[in-house]
């Protein structure tokens, strides 16, 4: 996935009201841009950190740009635009780059399922039946180690999705929790038990119920993203 247009570099002044960020561009222009991330963005929003943003050509849009990338304190690039994760996964699915999920005959997005009114990010159809996928974007890395963690904030919704997937797996339906790691320099993924122990517990229970837990790491550059390789998940 290449960015639709060249990204511009700047530095972060502040993030506020969840969806807004003030930045200063490399040319000294101060802008308020859209922050497309509902998480805490731990390690992705230290004051003064380097950021990259895309500009909008839509004159009707209130904000002139969207925050796309951050440089973490460890010098890694993180894609903070969580909407990119689903697009990146779909691109990889259609290209056959996720070997464990290859061979499907149809793909649908945002499909309702479960008893808790959830929507799966993807439903794949195979000759043998359906498969449901929940995608999570991972950008959290605590230190110099090459292990990323999820979530970066307490997520009741994420735990609900795991319960729904586990229920499918118990019925004999393939269910997948897929972590799209949009952080460079990562070699493995784990649940962030120190942030949300309930989520970690739900993930382990889902895996025991038969949910397939997969993680794929992206090559993150200022030109684009590429879902490059499978990563181990340390439960």
UniProtKB/Swiss-Prot annotation:
GN (gene name): sfsA
InterPro entries recorded: SfsA (IPR005224), SfsA_C (IPR040452), SfsA_N (IPR041465)
Name of the protein described by the UniProt record: Sugar fermentation stimulation protein homolog
Organism, as annotated: Pseudomonas aeruginosa (strain ATCC 15692 / DSM 22644 / CIP 104116 / JCM 14847 / LMG 12228 / 1C / PRS 101 / PAO1)
UniProt-listed NCBIfam families: sfsA (TIGR00230)
CDD domains: SfsA-like_bacterial (cd22359)
Family: Belongs to the SfsA family.
PANTHER family: SUGAR FERMENTATION STIMULATION PROTEIN A
Transmembrane segments: none
GO molecular function terms attached to this record: DNA binding
The organism's taxonomic lineage, starting at the top: Bacteria, Pseudomonadati, Pseudomonadota, Gammaproteobacteria, Pseudomonadales
């Amino acid at each position: 996935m290449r960015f639709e247009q060249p990204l511009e570099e700047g530095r972060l002044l502040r993030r506020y009201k969840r969806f807004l960020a003030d930045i200063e561009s490399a040319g000294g222009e101060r802008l308020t841009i859209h922050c497309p991330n509902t998480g805490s963005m731990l390690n992705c929003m230290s004051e003064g950190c380097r950021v990259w943003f895309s500009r909008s050509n839509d004159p009707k849009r209130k904000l002139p740009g969207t925050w796309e990338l951050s440089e973490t304190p460890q010098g890694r690039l993180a894609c903070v635009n969580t909407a990119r994760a689903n697009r990146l996964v779909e691109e990889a699915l259609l290209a056959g780059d996720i070997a464990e999920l290859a061979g499907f005959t149809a793909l649908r997005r945002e499909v309702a399922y479960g008893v808790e009114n959830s929507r799966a990010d993807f439903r794949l159809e195979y000759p043998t039946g359906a498969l449901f996928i929940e995608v999570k974007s991972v950008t959290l890395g605590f230190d110099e180690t090459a292990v990323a963690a999820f979530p970066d904030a307490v997520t009741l919704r994420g735990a609900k999705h795991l319960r729904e997937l586990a229920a499918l797996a118990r019925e004999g339906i393939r269910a997948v929790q897929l972590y799209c790691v949009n952080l460079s320099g990562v070699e493995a993924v784990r649940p962030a038990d120190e942030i949300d122990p309930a989520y970690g517990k739900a993930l382990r229970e889902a895996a025991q119920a038969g949910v397939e837990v997969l993680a794929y790491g992206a090559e993150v550059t200022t030109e684009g993203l590429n879902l490059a390789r499978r990563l181990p998940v340390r439960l």
